[in-house]
Amino acid sequence: MNKPLIRTERNGDWLRFGVKVQPRSSRNQIVGEHEGDLKIKVMAPPVEGAANQALQKFLAELFKLPKKDIRIVRGETSRHKIVEIRGIEAEKLLAFIPQITK
């Protein structure tokens, strides 16, 4: 089965892509693709930026990068966000997406 397609683009040293965040989950995890965006569950609630901070921390730990290399450029108060990560290629991002079964 092919990997799902996540739309990505380069912005200088940064890799930009969309994320659909599902807060108040039982654990932090990438669950797949949603309409061309990466779907990620985070345990934190969507209160006072807690889910955004949890998303940044999760991605930083996953890719072994400092948190300063992960930024939310759009969607601070929305479940649909545009995220940029410095220091990775699209192939590395796509390698972390689990196989989706129909």
From Swiss-Prot:
Gene3D superfamilies: YggU-like
Coiled coil: none
Pfam families to which the protein is assigned, alphabetical: DUF167
Top-level taxon of origin: Bacteria
One CC-aspect GO term: cytoplasm
Family of the protein in this entry: Belongs to the UPF0235 family.
Record PANTHER family: UPF0235 PROTEIN C15ORF40 (PTHR13420:SF7)
Name under which the protein is recorded: UPF0235 protein Swol_0959
